[in-house]
Amino acid sequence: MIIENNPATKQQHDDWRLRIKAEFSDTDFSVSSDYLCLIHYLDKAPQKFYSREAFKQYLTFLESVKLTDPKLLADILIEAEPLLSVSNRILTEVNDKPIHDTFLPKEHNDLINFIDKEIHYNLLKIYETPFFYLSKIIANYHWIKTKKATDGLDLYNSVEQLKKVGFGFVDKFYLHDVRNGIAHGKVIFTDVDITYIDKKGGKANIPTRKIIDTLDGILDIANGFCLAFKVFSLTNSDFFETYGIQIPQSILLEELQAKANGPAWTITNCLESVAMQDKKQLMIYVKNDNWDYSKVHWYSFTTAM
């Protein structure tokens, strides 16, 4: 493809592909060259600290079920696609926040203010969107196989199901009482710990700094799950095409950015829309700092390709 031969980025992209293949040596990348967005899990923090256990277990599940129950897996992924796209976008937003690998406030009052403003809010976002909807794919499959109605498959039940099928490591970082206290109840700070009270009066006491470790841990797991889903979706094009599964739009945007971004040219978003006569179109938003019209023309063409 022309876009892959952009002289400004070709050497870098070739290097990325070599490094990605080396990092995920058990994966066959021969079916497509569209996997450059995975470089974030090698170079960017906190993505590069993803849970290796979560990644391996999740990818093993997807590959296994693709062989044993392809139609059921396809149905689950088709239904989940819009929320998986939102989940990936929210996970990226939390990953990009300047709250990771930073010095914590030394004064206790400053620390609990940081926890209240940054940790609790982002912990709840991770629990309720990327962690939940990525976990729900696995739980949904097992509930359907055991003929359980999936209407009641909420976050708590999804986690309980995961713990039964080899994902027990999530129990350390999914704290249900903490989640309920932040979302629906009350949070009380003391000099040594934090008390989370849910709407029914249940309480959980957590050491102050442990809640920061909890965010780090659940973020690493969510990143591991999301990475596994990206590897699976970007290397199983035949399966996706056969069953009409759409790769979540936010993942496609990441791949487009990884491939088409260049010096003074940054893709910021893309949206599907309907033009006159009900014709579908894709609007791509770009931040351009080029003054040379020929460069703008080149990048516009290669981005559209």
Explain the meaning of each model-derived region:
Residues M1-D110, Y243-M305:
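Extended intrinsically disordered or low-complexity regions, especially N/C-terminal cytosolic tails and loops
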Residues M1, K163-V165, D238, I251:
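Extended charged low-complexity segments that act as oligomerization/scaffolding linkers
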